[in-house]
Amino acid sequence: MTRHYARSKSNERAVDSTPVNTPCSTTILSSVRLNGQTAYTVYHGGTTAEQFAEYLKSILLPTLSKDDIIVMDNMRSHHAKMVKKILDASVIRYLYLPPYSPDFNPIEKMWSKIKAYLRKVKIRVATELPNAIDKAFLTVCPSDCSGWFSSCYCVR
C-alpha cells in the first residue's frame, strides 16, 4: 500500500518512490469489539463464502459469548446460505446493516487506522506483510473502539 499524501518543505514538491510491480492481493477478514479485541485472518485472493464460513467457525465464533451480536455489511459472502446456516446453529445473534451504510459500521473506521499504518511502514516484500499486519492490529486500542462505536451510534 502506498500513502496518498506527503509533507515537504514550503514551496518544494513532496517526492517518494513506489515499485511498479503488481503483487497478488492479500485479504484480511476481521472483527472489532467495543473492548478493543479483534479476531482476524489473512490469506491471498478475494473473499468467498467458503472462506468467510471457515473464518466464522474457526476464528470468530469461538471467541464470542451468547450476549454478543455479529453485525455484517452486505458483502455477498455474508449472505451465503452456508454462512446463515452456521450462524443460525450458533447461539450468537446476527444482523445486517442497511445497504450503503458504512457510517454505521465501526469496522470501517478500524480499517482506516490499519491501512494508514500499513501505508506508513511501506512494506514492499510479501514475507514482511504478515508481521506488519500483526503490528497494525496491535495499534487498535479500547479507546479507539469506544470512539468508533460511539460515532456509529452503536453506544449511547
Language-model segments: residues:
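Mobile genetic element proteins and their domesticated derivatives, centered on retroelements
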Residues: 30, 56, 73, 87, ...
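Short, basic/hydrophobic alpha-helical segments
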Residues: 51-69
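Acidic/histidine-rich, metal-coordinating catalytic segments
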Residues: 66-79, 105
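C-terminal anion-handling pockets and recognition modules
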Residues: 38, 107-156
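RNase H-like polynucleotidyl transferase catalytic core
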Residues: 12-20, 90-106
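Short beta-strand segments
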Residues: 68-72, 96-98, 150
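Extended, low-complexity cationic-aromatic segments
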Residues: 1-57, 153-154
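Short, aromatic/basic amphipathic alpha-helical patches
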Residues: 80-90
